[in-house]
């Protein structure tokens, strides 16, 4: 009878340890998924910021180009 009790306790103990390890791995996996989602969100925000800067730079380049063309035409045709 004592042998059966010890065996039963051993099985229950190993089952509980196994269950706690699985739960811990599950929590770690969920935390990693959350971290990846946050990183994706940050990268999306960074992409939006970069696009905004590129749009501003593009429009600034257009303005500078028009001014340069106007200045060049003024110096090439000073009579106007």
Swiss-Prot record:
Database matches in Pfam families: FSAP_sig_propep
Segments for region (Disordered): 27-46
The keyword Secreted is assigned to this record: yes
Propeptide section residues: 23-49
A GO cellular component entry from the record: extracellular region
GO-annotated biological processes: defense response to bacterium
Signal sequence segment: 1-22
Key words of the record: Amphibian defense peptide, Antibiotic, Antimicrobial, Cleavage on pair of basic residues, Secreted, Signal
Keyword Signal found: yes
Known function: Has antibacterial activity.
Name this polypeptide is given: Raniseptin-2
